[in-house]
Amino acid sequence: PGERGASRLLVLDRETGKRIHSHFSHLLEYLPKGTLLIANNSRVVPARMIGQRPSGGKMEFLLLTPMPLLEQHGEGDGWHCAEADGLIKPAKNARIGDHLVFGDDLRVEVLAKGEFGRHRVRLHWTGDIRALFESRGHLPLPPYIKREDTKDDRGTYQTVYARDDKAGSVAAPTAGLHFTPELRAQM
């Protein structure tokens, strides 16, 4: 994306019907006094993992269940498990009972197939599940961006008001990406 706050802003004057071409950095000039803005302060997590099917084919898994909602159960020998929802690509290659492998310390067992690539799965892991995703996961970029994520994207695709204690989003609240710290301070 471009520089925060530099995007264009189209404003419609309701009284005159006139369209005004401006920039997002001038947003406050167009908001009526007393306007309430609601901000999604969740932090996007690197919830996309690249792994393999038992046959060796490449598979992609996007965790949809927020990590704080995972009900963890011990399996012994340091392993944990939890049921979750996620997207698997390619969905047609995921079969119920498959164990997708994402390293020696993370497996995803396919429990049920849903629509549009959504699956019910059981995660099996050792160690800290958040640390696994933070270290090896990929940031889920918007689908119109046709490239792999980079380290820089972890900052670019966060709002300036995203909070670490609100980590769990698997998609950036894109409307919020235009806000700058300066604009927030003026509010």
Language-model regions, residue ranges each:
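A cross-family signal for N-terminal binding/gating loops and helix N-caps
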Residues: P1-M187
